[in-house]
Amino acid sequence: MEQYDLPESEYLDKAPLQWTEAQHSDLIHRVEDAAQLADISVLSDLRHGTGFFDASRNVIHIREGNNSTEQLKSLLEGYSEAVITRTSTSDKPVAELESAALTALLQVRCGVPIDDQLAERITAALEDAGNVGGFSMRDSVARLHNAMEYCVRYAELEQTSEQYQAQQIEPEELTPQSEAFMEMM
């Protein structure tokens, strides 16, 4: 299997931001809007388990979480599966690998930690995909890159993160009284 090593500068500059509960709620709405733009319904279930995409009904099922981070995680799982299901031309084990990997990328991008369950899902999917004749990691990475660009564009994750990052870095605008006080100093 092919190995890809990136220089540190390739991934350290794109470290995930730390998101708050309110920001996760905003991301939930953005991802739901992106799904609706693609004519995919989102249905909340009172059950345990991961989010998933029901292709026959064109519905993403997400679990109700104890907080918005859990809900976002479930939604990203279902949304990733929907994107890969709609765009993948590969065998089912390869599509499962790409779906799990896209889920991980979106979670990292949104500041949601990767849990052991997702890590195990990726490991098992990689083993299964490796058994598919003609499996190419290079092709999967290329499809994953395109899927991530699609998700970022339609869910506006990049724009959202830049806005939050700018809010965290840029000071608030000074009032005329504050400016006058600063000039006196």
Residue ranges and their predicted role:
Residues 1-177, 182:
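N-terminal accessory/interface modules of nucleic-acid-binding and processing proteins
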